């Protein structure tokens, strides 16, 4: 029976003076899922008490390069040799093997090379097998540390990236499509905690549509324990923008309004960046000119992690993280309801600003939308 789960840190091993802060962020992330007393953080490794529950939890923790289920023995040559032979006995028959021993404890009686030879000879003396350092049937890893030695036979890939919260927070414009949940996941991987903003247009968007967004956020929230969803009633603004003289600009003006509202809300919440699931030139509103025009009134950075992705790349991630089955459910999206037959492909900020002069009540309506935002906490714990 395994005693521990050994965790290897991801990029945070490169972070110099800030490394302790990143390790503390990782510990807090682990504590979303695992009791504090079962976690031990060290400078280059973390250790968890072994359980299937703890093992499963690591699927939702960023900042981990890899992890292994390990046997823990005292750091003595006799104890290490005994456990290595025990593992070999459990795995036999096998034709070839290799030993990969590392001595972190410099006071240990053998160096790494001598320990490799000693353990290899012990197996050769007890089993009819051969050494194969390139592609062995069985490879046994040994890490000799100060208090204990950890022995294991495989590496499990972690999510990589940076620990959640290590990069701050972002306000993410969330829809029920395929792209925006995947974009949120990728931002989490870079250490950002996600706050979600969703625009609804009752009675056009029904309960089924809002439930779909809630379910998508539940999937993404697994990686951060819980998430705040800010919901804005956009019906009055949508109808008002619909009065503009150049109907081809409706989607552009709507998206500019989205971002002005998002920026006002973000500043109110002391959040320093916005984000979305936009992809360059995927649809009419995502040409370079459209993105430039929509972003023109905004001073906060707007993160677009999917900007250069092929749709198939995005779908692959959506399937992997479990959002795809929810995203493809039929629902009424605000953008779809409002789209003109022939949207403009190459808008300009100047033309958009001129058209907004026709809508003199727009700033007041946007301010009102922020004041009346509804807040929902979505938790998966």
From Swiss-Prot:
Pfam family, one: ThiI
THUMP domain location: 52-155
Entry annotated with the keyword Secreted: no
Top-level taxon: Bacteria
Residues the record lists as binding ATP: 173-174, 198-199, 255, 277, 286
E.C. no: 2.8.1.4
Molecular function terms from GO: ATP binding; CCA tRNA nucleotidyltransferase activity; tRNA binding; tRNA-uracil-4 sulfurtransferase activity
Enzyme class: transferase
SUPFAM superfamilies hit by this protein: Adenine nucleotide alpha hydrolases-like, THUMP domain-like
Function: Catalyzes the ATP-dependent transfer of a sulfur to tRNA to produce 4-thiouridine in position 8 of tRNAs, which functions as a near-UV photosensor. Also catalyzes the transfer of sulfur to the sulfur carrier protein ThiS, forming ThiS-thiocarboxylate. This is a step in the synthesis of thiazole, in the thiamine biosynthesis pathway. The sulfur is donated as persulfide by IscS.
Catalysed reactions, as listed in the record: [ThiI sulfur-carrier protein]-S-sulfanyl-L-cysteine + a uridine in tRNA + 2 reduced [2Fe-2S]-[ferredoxin] + ATP + H(+) = [ThiI sulfur-carrier protein]-L-cysteine + a 4-thiouridine in tRNA + 2 oxidized [2Fe-2S]-[ferredoxin] + AMP + diphosphate; [ThiS sulfur-carrier protein]-C-terminal Gly-Gly-AMP + S-sulfanyl-L-cysteinyl-[cysteine desulfurase] + AH2 = [ThiS sulfur-carrier protein]-C-terminal-Gly-aminoethanethioate + L-cysteinyl-[cysteine desulfurase] + A + AMP + 2 H(+)
Pathway linked to the protein: Cofactor biosynthesis; thiamine diphosphate biosynthesis
Organism: Metamycoplasma arthritidis (strain 158L3-1) (Mycoplasma arthritidis)
Annotated Gene Ontology cellular component terms: cytosol
Keywords: ATP-binding, Cytoplasm, Nucleotide-binding, RNA-binding, Thiamine biosynthesis, Transferase, tRNA-binding
Stated name of the protein: Probable tRNA sulfurtransferase
Family statement drawn from the similarity comment of this UniProt entry: Belongs to the ThiI family.
């Amino acid at each position: 029976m395994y005693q521990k789960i050994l965790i290897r840190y991801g990029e945070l091993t490169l972070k110099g003076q800030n490394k302790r802060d990143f390790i503390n962020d990782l510990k807090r992330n682990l504590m979303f899922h695992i009791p504090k007393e079962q976690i031990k953080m060290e400078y280059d490794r973390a250790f968890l008490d072994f359980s299937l529950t703890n093992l499963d939890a690591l699927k939702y923790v960023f900042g981990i390069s890899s992890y292994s289920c390990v046997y823990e023995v005292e750091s003595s040559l006799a104890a290490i040799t005994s456990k290595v032979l025990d593992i070999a006995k459990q795995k036999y028959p096998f034709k070839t093997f290799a030993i990969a021993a590392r001595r972190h404890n410099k006071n240990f009686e053998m160096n790494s090379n001598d320990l490799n030879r000693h353990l290899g000879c012990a197996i050769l003396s007890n089993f009819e097998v051969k050494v194969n350092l390139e592609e062995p049937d069985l490879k046994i890893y040994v890490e000799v540390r100060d208090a204990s030695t950890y022995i294991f036979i495989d590496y499990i890939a972690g999510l990589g990236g940076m620990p959640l919260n290590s990069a701050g927070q972002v306000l993410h414009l969330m829809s029920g499509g395929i792209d925006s949940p995947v974009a949120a996941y990728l931002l989490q991987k870079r250490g950002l905690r996600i706050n979600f903003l969703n625009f609804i247009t009752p009675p056009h968007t029904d309960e089924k549509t809002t439930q779909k967004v809630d379910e998508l956020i539940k999937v993404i929230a697994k990686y951060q324990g819980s998430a705040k969803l800010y919901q804005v009633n956009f019906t009055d603004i949508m109808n008002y923008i619909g009065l503009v003289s150049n109907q081809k600009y409706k989607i552009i003006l709507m998206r500019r309004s989205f971002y002005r509202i998002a920026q006002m809300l973000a500043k109110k919440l002391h959040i320093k960046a916005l984000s979305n699931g936009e992809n360059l030139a995927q649809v009419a509103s995502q040409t370079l000119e459209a993105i430039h025009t929509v972003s023109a009134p905004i001073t906060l950075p707007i993160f677009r992690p999917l900007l250069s992705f092929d749709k198939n790349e995005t779908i692959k991630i959506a399937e992997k993280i479990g959002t795809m089955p929810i995203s493809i459910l039929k629902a009424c999206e605000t953008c779809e309801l409002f789209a003109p037959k022939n949207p403009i492909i190459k808008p300009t900020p100047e033309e958009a600003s001129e058209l907004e002069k026709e809508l003199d009540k727009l700033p007041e309506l946007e301010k009102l939308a922020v004041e009346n935002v509804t807040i929902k906490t979505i938790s998966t714990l």
